[in-house]
Structure formats: structure tokens, C-alpha cells
UniProtKB/Swiss-Prot annotation:
Membrane topology type: Single-pass membrane protein
Subunit structure: The Tat system comprises two distinct complexes: a TatABC complex, containing multiple copies of TatA, TatB and TatC subunits, and a separate TatA complex, containing only TatA subunits. Substrates initially bind to the TatABC complex, which probably triggers association of the separate TatA complex to form the active translocon.
Membrane-spanning segments: 1-21
GO cellular component: TAT protein transport complex
Protein name: Sec-independent protein translocase protein TatA
Superkingdom, natural source: Bacteria
One GO MF term: protein transmembrane transporter activity
Keyword match Nucleotide-binding: no
Organism: Methylobacterium sp. (strain 4-46)
Function according to Swiss-Prot or TrEMBL: Part of the twin-arginine translocation (Tat) system that transports large folded proteins containing a characteristic twin-arginine motif in their signal peptide across membranes. TatA could form the protein-conducting channel of the Tat system.
Amino acid sequence: MGGASIWHWIVVGVIVMLLFGRGKVSELMGDVAKGIKAFKKGMADEDQPQAPVVAAPPVTATEPVRTLPPHPTEPAPATHATVDRKVV
């Protein structure tokens, strides 16, 4: 009682097949196999030394940088016309 015999596993397998169907179980196992292969490939790639990264040479400007003239410190004169009104 309490031990997992072969008959227990057969019953569990039959219940899983009835619940999920044959197509879902095989699809799930295929996805698990792909995941294991990807993991192994990633571990193998990690062990290999990687080529050193070569930095690109700095880009130099072909035109000199232009500067803006300084802002005037005095306020500009008013350009709008004033209207003379008579106060009655």
C-alpha cells in the first residue's frame, strides 16, 4: 500500500490520456524535448570562448561646429504704434 508499483503508473497514464487526449500529450512532450535541446545548446555555447569585440573608431566631424551669437542684453524697442486717445 503506499508504494508506487507499475500498475499505479499505468492507471495514472491512462487517466492522463483520457483527460488530455493523445495529441495534447505528444505535443507537450515535443515541447519539453525542444526545451531540453535549447538548454543543452545554450550550455554548450556558454563554454566556448567568444571572439573579442572590436570597438568602432570614433567618428570625426567634417564641418566645424557653429556657435550662435550671444543674445542682446538690452531690450528691443517697442515696434507697435501707440494710439493717441482724447479723454473727454
